[in-house]
Amino acid sequence: IPSIYLKKNSNIIDIGGGTSSLVDKLLIEGFESISVLDISSNALEKSKHRLGKKSKQVQWIIGDVLKVDLPLQCFDLWHDRAAMHFLTNVNDRQVYRSKVLASLKPGGFIAILTFAEDGPDRCSGLPVQRFSIDTLSHEFGKNVCLVAGEKHSHCTPGGMEQRFLSCLFQLTGAHE
């Protein structure tokens, strides 16, 4: 996110944000329009509790990203640190893609962290979809341009190395 120039009033949504501290950091940096979506109401409640009074500055959305109604052409940044890789069904990924593209403003950004093609095939006991820069770019189609992509490693508390892929895309074409 630091590599993107966003105004403090930019609309940001964090998909699968749950107990992530990204919302804390965005508030500290002065961002004014933050939404956090997660399927777990418990995870969102933990974040609200952690933030205290600041939690009132955030729009909290409980729901499945594939089913929740999101505003059209609203967001300047769609951030997903750990949700898309759980979409192992191609139809689910097509719905996800449609949600992303419909809810982004023209010129909006997509920041996604997923498991790399040589990353683990399961997370929290569930199967995951792994991606290369090319396959992730293909998922979003021709109206989205890759700004940056990078593979990196993470060491789990158990000492296992996991390979991740982080990509930043920008909506450059017409909405579909």
Regions found by a protein language model. Name each.
Residues 1-73, 87-103, 108-176:
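Class I (Rossmann-like) S-adenosyl-L-methionine-dependent methyltransferase catalytic domain
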Residues 79:
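A conserved beta-strand element that flanks and buttresses the S-adenosyl-L-methionine
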Residues 82-86:
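Short catalytic micro-motifs in class I SAM-dependent methyltransferases
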